From Swiss-Prot:
Formed by 2 beta-barrels, each is capped on both ends by short alpha-helices. Pfam families: PTAC (PF06130). Its cofactor is Zn(2+). The lineage of its organism: Bacteria, Pseudomonadati, Pseudomonadota, Gammaproteobacteria, Enterobacterales. This is Phosphate propanoyltransferase.
């Protein structure tokens, strides 16, 4: 096989890899807590992992809280671990309407100017001064995944949701690259419902490049 044939074969394999299915994680409403806020809501209670998530070291905990807004409340909202530097509440647009909170669309961690919310646990209540967002849809990936897919951290791409009877293309999907990340697209329950997506059966494919 000469160099031209080898290059052609490599490019063909890479093109096939770029079309491989991307797993979908459907994010229900959940919270992340800073250590001090966790200690106040769950005094002397160690975090109890309930289910491991696809991203390494991350998990859904046994602990839940109630979210309370000006217009309503949402019960049994799951805590995700491990603990973070800053508390954050992630909800859908539908949840925001129920609560009566004008939660902005943000990437995780971009919390400046976000509204607060009241959290109630079985042990205590806590009023957060900010940190409530609707999470922007995004894809986690490793540097190798990014190299294969020809994207970079911070890029915005379009992604097709496949495997349902309501195939949908989402624009403005943020790319998040880190060495410890596994390939996975995250959408919220509103977005999953719009696409008729079930995490066990649906998948995503990259359809445009930045």
């Amino acid at each position: 096989m000469d160099k031209q044939q080898l290059a052609s074969t490599v490019n063909k394999v890479l093109d096939e890899m770029r079309q491989r299915p991307i797993p979908i994680g459907i994010s229900s409403r959940h919270i992340h807590l800073a250590a001090a806020d966790y200690a106040r809501l769950f005094p002397a209670q160690p975090i109890q992992p309930k289910k491991a998530l696809l991203q390494p070291g991350q998990y859904a905990a046994e602990q839940t809280v109630t979210l309370v807004g000006p217009k309503g409340r949402l019960n049994n909202v799951r805590l995700l671990g491990p603990l973070r530097q800053t508390s954050q509440v992630e909800i859908s647009r539908t949840d925001a309407r129920i609560l009566g909170i004008a939660a902005p669309l943000r990437m995780s961690g971009n919390l400046q100017g976000t509204p607060g919310i009241r959290l109630i646990s079985p042990f205590a209540e806590l009023e957060l001064s900010g940190g409530t967002i609707v999470a922007q849809r995004h894809i986690h990936m490793s540097p190798l995944d990014a190299l294969i897919l020809r994207v970079s951290h911070g890029d915005s791409v379009a992604v097709a949701i496949e495997g349902s009877d309501r195939r949908l293309i989402f624009d403005n999907v943020a790319v998040r690259v880190a060495p410890d990340m596994r390939l996975e697209m995250h959408i919220d329950t509103d977005e999953a419902n719009a696409a008729g997506a079930d995490a066990a059966q649906a998948w995503a494919t990259l359809v445009t490049k930045p």
